[in-house]
């Protein structure tokens, strides 16, 4: 399975997801500014992976910090990383975790602080892999044997520290002996499904068929799809789900055709401070992602473009939310809160 991100003595090493599937290349970030750029430019993407990258960004930032006004330097590091992408709550969760640890060590020798932050960032990474495997185990039973699973965007090993959330459920179902295959939406405009999900599943020899986003309803109506499993970037207290743009359309089609629609995400993706998805900030990305594909224009020059990176799926379309602590069902205000407080 692909290694998405790793801490090394030379810096934070991550696979360059903008180059896949044609080129498997790795980028080494040697300071926190380079980590921030990698997150913003989607060299690394996926909510859990962004969280791990942010933790490592704080750690590497403090490695290069001087003795003077360390508090101010840590604040700047955290603020820079927090400004990279607004929707994925895991980013802020990881930054807050690292900042709290730093706060608990304020006044200790700088080398001790540096060492402890590195260790914590590595713990965040290892925890994420273990969490993803637990999500997979909890979701495997929900996947119907002998059917096709539809997924949107990429919520696999590439979107996490390893194994994946939505693709982790698929992997776990196959490991349990189920005979399933996958339909992957191409996921315009950044093509995460075509470029990343198909490539990743091919690495594991999982049977995968690529379809365009506007084909999903056709195959659901034809009875080909057993269930839909997607990831999430932020989940509100009422169960509304922010995920890659186009997810809402898939969920509506699934409801219309009686296809179960599952969301696989770690507890860290829950944002119970938000009562509904209407409060989730939606990132707007550049027009060039829509007007160009691999650097080639596909629209007339000067075309007006809107490019929201995410949409919000209302909870009424969600059959279940699969976490490492179990599966939540409606009413989500109660079930999600119960999962969060579960030891």
Curated annotation (Swiss-Prot):
Gene3D superfamilies: translation initiation factor eif-2b, domain 1 (1.20.120.420), Translation initiation factor eif-2b, domain 2 (3.40.50.10470). It catalyses: 5-(methylsulfanyl)-alpha-D-ribose 1-phosphate = 5-(methylsulfanyl)-D-ribulose 1-phosphate. GO terms for biological process: L-methionine salvage from methylthioadenosine. Pathway: Amino-acid biosynthesis; L-methionine biosynthesis via salvage pathway; L-methionine from S-methyl-5-thio-alpha-D-ribose 1-phosphate: step 1/6. The gene is mtnA. Belongs to the eIF-2B alpha/beta/delta subunits family. MtnA subfamily. GO terms for molecular function: S-methyl-5-thioribose-1-phosphate isomerase activity. Its EC number is 5.3.1.23. SUPFAM superfamilies: NagB/RpiA/CoA transferase-like (SSF100950). InterPro entries: IF-2B-related, IF-M1Pi, IF_2B-like_C, Initiation_fac_2B_a/b/d, M1Pi_N, NagB/RpiA_transferase-like. Keywords: Amino-acid biosynthesis, Isomerase, Methionine biosynthesis. The active site is at residue 233. It comes from the Bacteria. Catalyzes the interconversion of methylthioribose-1-phosphate (MTR-1-P) into methylthioribulose-1-phosphate (MTRu-1-P). This is Methylthioribose-1-phosphate isomerase. Substrate binds at residues 45-47, 85, 192, 243-244. The record marks 153 as: Transition state stabilizer.
